[in-house]
């Protein structure tokens, strides 16, 4: 199966310029994807383009990841409604280094093979290019009429937009077009890929190559990923789902994929994993037979978490999930680091308790009625303790008068109380 066929069955092609498939079948081809370096981590919205590059390299072709150091200083107006913050060079260089480390989990940069991946930064060829030379050499080839016809420009200049568009952002498509021309000349790059919102910018590049060099270059875009309910993919109430554990813990990352709908899981497993058609068909059959077991979501969450983080992080995330949603032990709870513990119990009631009072020792029954409103009365707590329905840190509480002190704390700060099977409370010593 060639690259285009692979993307087709995965639902990853929106538009493709005529001649693209023939070019790829003819010879080893270099293709690039542009990556916005405005943060020092990729988020899952970037993953579609990254997976395209991964499939491209697996098909024997040469992937190029272009970090938009120069264009990132401006901001792409495509489908955006406001001007972007501009970044300084030191920040962009730091972001580039972080992004390359993440990309190395998907692409082989170190191989001696002719299709080894390469990372480039357009700031390296734009920083010495004077404005006068640029508008003389490049600007003369693309008319304002051509640039105004792009959907992203029309949208920002429409009456509905109160923001308007600066000359800086208007010039963005010329800069991206020049990137393609530069890579065509210096890296033999014949294909640019991206999301459907990039079609206008990509075709500006193919047009520039045609007009300046008489060369043939191609374009391929993937659909913008949406959710079945029409919501925005990759966003939660707390913001983006990042690939860097500093911003999104492996547990939260795993939970995001585990909780997608059946319809989304069937779509995402083709786009965000390397699983074959046969493997996915088998999972779909399992899902149809026993949807309550959610085999698609579980496999999707496993594959993406292992790919982005590690097998160990995936296993820890599963174990952490079992603490809240299944049967787990005191030992499993002790293994959780503080970030994962807080992520797991983010949605349960929290109570602050005095560290000094706890250090002196407090009876469990007083702690759960007077210091934290877990039980409305001591009598009710006694009744549930007698039937084995109360646990502290996943250990059954045998007596309501058991004295709790600082030695019971997790990470010297937290105490987890469970009332019945499903009610959890997190006490925080302060």
From Swiss-Prot:
Its EC number is 6.1.1.1. SUPFAM superfamilies: Alpha-L RNA-binding motif (SSF55174), Nucleotidylyl transferase (SSF52374). The keyword Nucleotide-binding applies. It is an enzyme of class 6 (ligase). It holds the Pfam family SYY_C-terminal. It is found in: Cytoplasm. GO terms for cellular component: cytosol. A motif ('HIGH' region) lies at residues 37-46. CDD domains: TyrRS_core. Residues 362-429 form the S4 RNA-binding domain. GO terms for biological process: tyrosyl-tRNA aminoacylation. GO terms for molecular function: ATP binding; RNA binding; tyrosine-tRNA ligase activity. Homodimer. HAMAP family: Tyr_tRNA_synth_type1. This is Tyrosine--tRNA ligase. It comes from Parabacteroides distasonis (strain ATCC 8503 / DSM 20701 / CIP 104284 / JCM 5825 / NCTC 11152).
